[in-house]
């Protein structure tokens, strides 16, 4: 469970000390003003309360739906599928794939289950009975394929119900990131804390300082003919500043610039680098671009949520092909033999057999951890969603450089997850004039959860590097957004003749 705002920060019975100091004392009221947080404690309490409010609202909506909506309304809204038969349909990197379909394999009808959604699997209702959570792998007209960590008992017996579920893991990881961000224990959090809270005299000057990252870097000539001048300027700033905001209006090549920056950082040996985004689609786009440029990139996250053509680059896929799998297979075979012999053993022999089983399990865990560390250490860039970067596999690993795409679509606590892994150089890519973060609770949104860290830092005074050439719109279509949102600074990278009207469409004179 997440700690409520104002309570002592703790995890599994441990209490962490929180740094309530600021680098500079200021007069005035406590709390946030114009993007500035005068005290870290206020920032922590504020966002802890908003996360709790958001979780409460999301849980309340789902519980209300499950307890009071009729089966007909749930199905008509596309939020539940009932009367489905289940069966096994293979595995995906060690997890079971289940197929759910009507007994006569008729069309499922209109529903809102899509790839990557969390589903709750139950017999008749998700309240009051044991449930299993899964993730949608694929949707078809007559069936859903769902990946589960543990399949339900008696899968082929009777029928099943599927409901759209809530993601508590995301809320828990955001709360933990808040605790890490404000912790003063060891090397937790980030050296950028003061500038991110706005507690420095001149935020822009502070952000422009060179990052303090130890290590030997190669000096590689930067020749980027594929970047236009504004993209190249943004990349150069990101390479030399401790905090850079890259603002990319529609069609200006945000992800293209992000990939070029990551590739240059990797070429100079500045890893390990953590590249994140709020959505799986955006992370996949970063990963694809990096792989195409020859960067050794590894994708963290369940393969079911990763684009099929990129799954070979996931950590799970690379672990499956790791040479140490042969050692693990031998140990598992030995363990299976001991299990088969157990019923015939008695007394001391049985005790020794149980000891051998436990010893083998411990050895398998050690080998699995070695495999994970070797794959991660070989990577130049590790790609993940913001939430995914809080996975236990990355516990204890520090990432001096963090690049975050889609930064304007992430609530601030989500952005803090990758940042709180020892970030010393931060690059935020996005556009606060486009989609804001998605927030369910109106109260939480109005009190600040709907504003991204990206936008707040601009309010503090950090100057964004604008990508000013767009390649998507007809020049006439560009005129309004350029004037309305970007101070007439947008230019065209395409001509009117390159954006003709669709054939057969009659335009009014």
Identify the role of each PLM range:
Residues 5, 10-24, 28-52, 105-233, ...:
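Pre-ATPase regulatory/linker segments immediately N-terminal to the P-loop/RecA-like helicase/translocase core
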Residues 11-16, 95-96, 194-200, 204-219, ...:
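Conserved P-loop NTPase motor core of helicases/translocases
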Residues 94-105:
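Short, structured beta-strand/loop micro-motifs enriched in basic residues and often containing a Trp
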Residues 223-242, 257, 384:
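N-terminal pre-P-loop "Q-motif" helix
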Residues 268-271, 279, 387-509:
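Conserved helicase motor core of SF1/SF2 NTP-dependent helicases
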Residues 244-245, 274:
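Short hydrophobic/aromatic beta-strand immediately N-terminal to the Walker A/P-loop
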Residues 255-263:
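Motif I (Walker A/P-loop) of helicase-class P-loop NTPases
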Residues 251:
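Walker A (P-loop) phosphate-binding loop of P-loop NTPases
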């Amino acid at each position: 469970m997440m700690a409520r705002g104002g309570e002592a920060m703790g995890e599994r019975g441990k209490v962490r000390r929180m740094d309530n100091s600021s680098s500079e004392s200021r007069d005035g009221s406590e709390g946030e003003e114009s993007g500035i947080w005068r005290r870290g404690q206020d920032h922590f309490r504020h966002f802890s309360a908003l996360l709790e409010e958001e979780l409460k609202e999301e849980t309340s909506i789902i519980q209300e739906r499950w307890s009071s909506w009729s089966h007909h309304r749930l199905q008509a809204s596309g939020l539940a599928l009932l009367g489905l038969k289940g069966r096994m349909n293979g595995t995906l990197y060690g997890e079971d794939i289940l197929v759910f379909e009507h007994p006569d394999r008729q069309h499922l009808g209109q529903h809102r289950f899509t790839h990557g959604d969390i589903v709750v699997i139950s017999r008749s209702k998700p309240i009051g009975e044991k449930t299993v959570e899964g993730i949608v792998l694929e949707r078809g007209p007559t069936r859903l394929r769902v990946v589960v960590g543990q399949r339900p008992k008696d899968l082929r017996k009777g029928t099943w119900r599927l409901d759209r579920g809530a993601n508590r893991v995301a809320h828990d990881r955001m709360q933990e990131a808040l605790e890490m961000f404000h912790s003063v224990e060891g090397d937790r959090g980030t050296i950028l804390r003061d500038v991110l809270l706005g507690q420095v005299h001149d935020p822009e000057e502070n952000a422009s300082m060179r990052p303090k990252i130890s290590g030997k870097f190669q000096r590689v000539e930067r020749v980027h003919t594929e970047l236009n001048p504004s993209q190249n300027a943004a990349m150069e700033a990101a390479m030399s500043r401790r905090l850079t905001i890259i603002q990319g209006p529609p069609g200006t090549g945000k992800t293209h610039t992000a990939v070029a920056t990551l590739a240059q950082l990797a070429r100079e040996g500045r890893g390990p680098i953590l590249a994140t985004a709020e959505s799986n689609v955006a992370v996949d786009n970063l990963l694809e671009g990096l792989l195409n440029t020859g960067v050794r990139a590894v994708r963290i996250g369940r393969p079911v949520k990763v684009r099929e053509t990129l799954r070979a680059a996931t950590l799970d896929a690379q672990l499956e092909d790791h040479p140490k799998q042969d050692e693990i297979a031998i140990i598992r075979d030995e363990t299976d033999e001991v299990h088969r012999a157990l019923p015939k053993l008695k007394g001391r022999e049985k005790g020794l057999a149980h000891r051998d089983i436990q010893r083998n399990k411990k050895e398998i865990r050690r080998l699995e951890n070695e495999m994970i560390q070797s794959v991660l250490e070989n990577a130049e860039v590790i790609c993940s969603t913001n939430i995914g970067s809080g996975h236990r596999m990355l516990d204890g690993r520090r990432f001096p450089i963090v690049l975050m795409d889609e930064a304007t679509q992430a609530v601030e606590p989500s952005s803090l997850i990758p940042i709180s892994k020892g970030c010393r150089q931060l690059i935020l890519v996005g556009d606060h004039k486009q989609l804001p973060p998605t927030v369910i609770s109106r109260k939480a949104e109005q009190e600040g959860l709907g504003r991204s860290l990206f936008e707040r830092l601009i309010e503090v005074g950090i100057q964004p590097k604008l990508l000013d050439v767009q390649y998507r719109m007809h020049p006439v279509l560009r005129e309004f957004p350029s004037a309305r949102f970007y101070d007439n600074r947008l230019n065209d990278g395409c001509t009117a003749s390159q954006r003709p009207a669709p054939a057969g469409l009659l335009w009014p004179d």
